[in-house]
Regions:
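Short glycine-/aliphatic-rich beta-strand segments at the starts of folded cytosolic domains
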Residues: 1-9
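Residues at or immediately flanking beta-strands
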Residues: 3, 31-33
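Aromatic side chains
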Residues: 5, 13, 61-62
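A generic secondary-structure micro-motif detector
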Residues: 8, 41-42
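Short, thiol/selenol-centered motifs that function as redox-active sites or metal-ligating centers
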Residues: 9-18
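C-terminal structural segments of small proteins and small subunits
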Residues: 20-24, 28-30, 42-67
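Short Gly/Ser/Thr- and Asp/Glu-enriched loop/turn motifs at secondary-structure junctions
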Residues: 34-39
Length: 67
């Protein structure tokens, strides 16, 4: 499981865009949660940190860190 801290999400549409982008990425098994208030996404899978960062940044958001 990975927790991705994301800056720039400001509404439910933002969280939906992040969820859709992550779900489309090879190596992401499931998106467990995308939290607007917590500014993070929680995923299961084997996608690399670089791939996760790239797909989120392509949507216009910044990855702060991945745990």
């Amino acid at each position: 499981m990975k927790k991705i801290y994301i800056d720039g999400m400001s509404c439910d549409h933002c969280t939906a865009h992040v969820r859709e982008a992550l779900e489309a990425l090879d190596g992401v098994g499931r998106v467990l949660e995308v939290s607007l208030s917590g500014k993070y996404a929680l995923i299961e899978g084997s996608a690399s940190d670089d791939a996760l960062t790239a797909v989120i940044e392509e949507e216009g958001y910044d990855v702060i860190r991945i745990e």
